[in-house]
Structure formats: C-alpha cells, structure tokens
C-alpha cells in the first residue's frame, strides 16, 4: 500500500470520524480521483507542442494522457470542432495516492513564492481545484528537455459532501493550505 493510503487508513479516517461524528464508515470522506488537465491553445498551430506536452504529462502522472478535442468551432480562437486542443489524465487508486504524495511533499515546495494553496478553491461539494503555472516543479521533468513552460489544472475529487469535510480530509494528508 502507498504511504498516503496507509496514513488515510491509520490516522485520517479516525480523525474525520471523531470530528464530524459519522455513524456509517462509508460516510467518511475519501479521495476518489485526481485529474490533471493541460489546455494547449498553441497546439492548433504546432502539433509538436501536443506531443511534447503529452510526453511530459505521462512522466508526471505515470500514465498515458488522452487528447482532448474542441467541442465546437470558435473563430476568435481560430479552432475548429474536433481539433486536438489539450490533454488530460485521470488518476485513481494507488497512482492517485502516489501522485498526491509526490505533489504535496516534493512538487508544491518547489513552487516559486509558495505560501500555501488557497483554501477557498473548493467547489461547494468538497472537491478542490488548483492551477500550476509551470511543469518544472515536478522532479520527473528534465529541465534540459523542456521546450516551453506550460501550466496545468489539478482537480482533487473527494466523496466529501461539504467544503469543510473536503478541507479536513486534505489537511489530514498535510496538504499545504494558506493560513
């Protein structure tokens, strides 16, 4: 079992049960998935951008990303329906816990001027969204091979019913929230 998963089973689960007074063990919030998304508007002009972004995301996530396509044509963005405009990967189970462990303990401290993540970025249903400005914070990415600095969106989906429960769950994993 992964370190973060063991921590959840041993400490976080009981702490959440004590704090919120759940009657049923299935009520206790848990992580369900982590989604990484990279929107690449410049991929319209250069297909190599998409390939390198896919390779970098595969390195970061440990899983091959899928391409995302434009749902409709937008003249202002110079895109047509069905053109590839990004890539995403959904992590579950062990890979999700491994990624989150690396993100919290290695990648997040490497963010420039990092003082913690905003605790207001919950969506009202216990899920947390954050953006990363550069992929270089991940140790898997070789600085020499990077052709452009790209950011990504990270969504942490939980089974929590409220933002307070979701925040308590992530704090149990030592997620660095701003005070």
Curated annotation (Swiss-Prot):
Give yes or no: UniProt keyword Protein biosynthesis. Answer: no
**SUPFAM superfamilies associated with the record:** RL5-like
* Taxonomic superkingdom: Bacteria
One Pfam family assigned to this protein is Ribosomal_L5
Instruction: Check the record and name the InterPro entries matching this protein.
Output: Ribosomal_uL5, Ribosomal_uL5_bac-type, Ribosomal_uL5_C, Ribosomal_uL5_CS, Ribosomal_uL5_dom_sf, Ribosomal_uL5_N
Q: Could you mention a single GO BP entry for this protein?
A: translation
Q: Which UniProt keywords apply?
A: Ribonucleoprotein, Ribosomal protein, RNA-binding, rRNA-binding, tRNA-binding
A single GO molecular function term of this UniProt record = tRNA binding
Entry GO CC: ribonucleoprotein complex; ribosome
Q: Which family does it belong to?
A: Belongs to the universal ribosomal protein uL5 family.
Chain's role: This is one of the proteins that bind and probably mediate the attachment of the 5S RNA into the large ribosomal subunit, where it forms part of the central protuberance. In the 70S ribosome it contacts protein S13 of the 30S subunit (bridge B1b), connecting the 2 subunits; this bridge is implicated in subunit movement. Contacts the P site tRNA; the 5S rRNA and some of its associated proteins might help stabilize positioning of ribosome-bound tRNAs.
Q: What is this protein called?
A: Large ribosomal subunit protein uL5
Q: Which organism is it from?
A: Alkalilimnicola ehrlichii (strain ATCC BAA-1101 / DSM 17681 / MLHE-1)
């Amino acid at each position: 079992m992964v370190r973060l998963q063991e921590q959840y089973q041993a400490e976080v689960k009981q702490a959440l049960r004590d704090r919120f007074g759940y009657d049923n063990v299935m009520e206790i919030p848990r992580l369900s998935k982590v989604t990484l998304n990279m929107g690449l508007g410049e991929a319209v002009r250069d297909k190599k951008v998409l390939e390198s972004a896919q390779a970098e995301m595969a390195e970061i996530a440990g899983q091959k990303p899928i391409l995302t396509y434009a749902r409709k044509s937008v003249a202002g963005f110079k895109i047509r329906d069905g053109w590839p405009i990004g890539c995403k990967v959904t992590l579950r189970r062990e890979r999700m816990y491994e990624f989150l462990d690396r993100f919290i303990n290695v990648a997040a401290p490497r963010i420039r001027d990092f003082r913690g993540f905003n605790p207001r970025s919950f969506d009202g249903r216990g899920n947390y969204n954050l953006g990363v400005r550069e992929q270089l914070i991940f140790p898997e990415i070789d600085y020499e091979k990077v052709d452009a600095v790209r950011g990504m969106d990270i969504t942490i989906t939980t089974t929590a019913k409220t933002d307070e429960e979701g925040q308590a769950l992530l704090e149990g994993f030592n997620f660095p929230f701003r005070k």
